[in-house]
């Protein structure tokens, strides 16, 4: 994992946004983005992994503009924009769009693999399990 002042800033935002959130397995949600970040190379990818759900889950408190003002570079902002699944957009259209950005693609692939790991979810499959597997196959092929 890459360590820098920007990564520290991303960690602080991640923790502030998700500190009270719990994942479907009952674990603190912050474990999930930290796990994804350990699989990334380079500052931009690590920051993107750490922040990948902040806008989608806590858009009432965080925005791309606020993250830009905080000093995150365009590569991170672009990937986060693509990783934020807009309401009403079919899931595979969303996946096809984000696949064009190498950082967004790597983060989403790690995210999907972690979200389909039933060991971390107390043996339960997510509702969208089959769709997630379809997205994994697509992202592995592009």
Where do the model's predicted regions map?
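Active-site helical microenvironments for divalent-metal-assisted chemistry
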Residues: 1-142
């Amino acid at each position: 994992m890459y360590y820098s002042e920007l990564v520290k800033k991303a960690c602080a935002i991640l923790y502030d946004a998700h500190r009270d959130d719990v994942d479907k397995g009952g674990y603190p949600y912050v474990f999930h983005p930290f796990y994804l970040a350990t699989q990334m190379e380079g500052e931009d990818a690590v920051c993107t992994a750490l922040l990948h759900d902040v806008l989608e889950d806590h858009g009432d408190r965080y925005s791309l503009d606020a993250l830009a003002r905080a000093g995150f570079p365009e590569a991170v902002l672009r990937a986060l924009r693509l990783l934020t699944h807009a309401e009403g957009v079919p899931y595979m259209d969303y996946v096809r769009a984000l696949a064009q950005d190498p950082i967004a693609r790597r983060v989403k692939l790690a995210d999907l693999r972690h979200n389909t790991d039933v060991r971390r979810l107390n043996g339960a499959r997510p509702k969208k399990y089959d769709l997630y597997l379809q997205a994994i196959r697509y992202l592995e092929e592009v």
